[in-house]
């Protein structure tokens, strides 16, 4: 059996880092971890080929070679996924589809032969059994949550690691919180399910033996969902492994703001090699936080919490949202000031949208305010419901935030604020990579010589070189990120 696995293309967004990737001669940020894991669940004697369309071109010969074409995608990849499905239909190729896009919107995919939905650990074996017996059904679903202690190691040999800036790894699924706009609990539940420490170490080993050295992103919905197990088992095991392997990876992940309440946890994460954590800040407006059921963010000094996490050597990357019912006309300036004061360099600001199945979508349906399905991209200047604030004022205010925070003056001011306060707790092991040396020279030319940010670039360049040389590579990385953010925001604004 010949199996073609296809990962559709991402559009050009803030999260794609397309304009930053060119500096390091990479094609995509992360490999398709879900498909690589699904590949490991298929029979070993099947021939498998994987095409990540963010890194390689999908040609008709690939489709014609396959007995089955497996497609996995998130909502933001829907346009590319639809194109792939149409091509497969035209070539009479049988399609197996799964992942968040198809799970949340299966009613739109009658042109897919087999929909294997929800978590693959549960539904895929049933499909494979039916396929072997010659009685496959169109749709496989489950209301159960998978036991991820049985999840196999990803088949990394199906992709070229050189195409990517970072590898990824999953330790847990689910989140204990229930923000009304978030579909994570719809897809994966509120009780965090975790892998064993043996699984985590085996996955780190697997990546290590591929020869990979550099960033590894833990893609968990909320890495600190189960703090007790993390502190007792997982982080000590990772710390020991990293020391034994001479710190080959730089780790980062996503977590909730209550990380700031646990000094031991922050200290352990820093010692284990974690360097950055993405946190959903959402809004400095207390009423908006209560509205979206984000109690962990309410009733606290958010900037103080961010600064505390950073003092433990963890860079905070932040997500922000505008468009809540309780947002007032001053919210745009308040978010801009908050981002600047906090020193959050990577600040992702999006418009509120209501994904399918969320509490927010259900409320808006009852209120008659839903307009269409969410595209999966909350930074594309579209909103899928009728907001309380005038739509034109909302979009204008949103554009003003982006034009301000991603302008060279404000962006580099924020970088300098962060760099002055930040002290990594763990010495970084330097891994010589010709692409990153090339990125330095490309940044000098594109940002330091011909870019509108050149004055700010050189100020950051020399300040870091002489004051904090240990952060020099991070400073250049931030400058490259700033270029990408500016390009995207200019394209929309």
Language-model features: where?
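Conserved beta-strand positions
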Residues: 5, 71, 218-220, 279, ...
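Structural beta-sheet core signal
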Residues: 5, 50, 97, 218, ...
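Flexible glycine/acidic-rich beta-alpha junction loops that bind and position SAM and/or redox cofactors
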Residues: 10-16, 104-107, 226-228, 287-292, ...
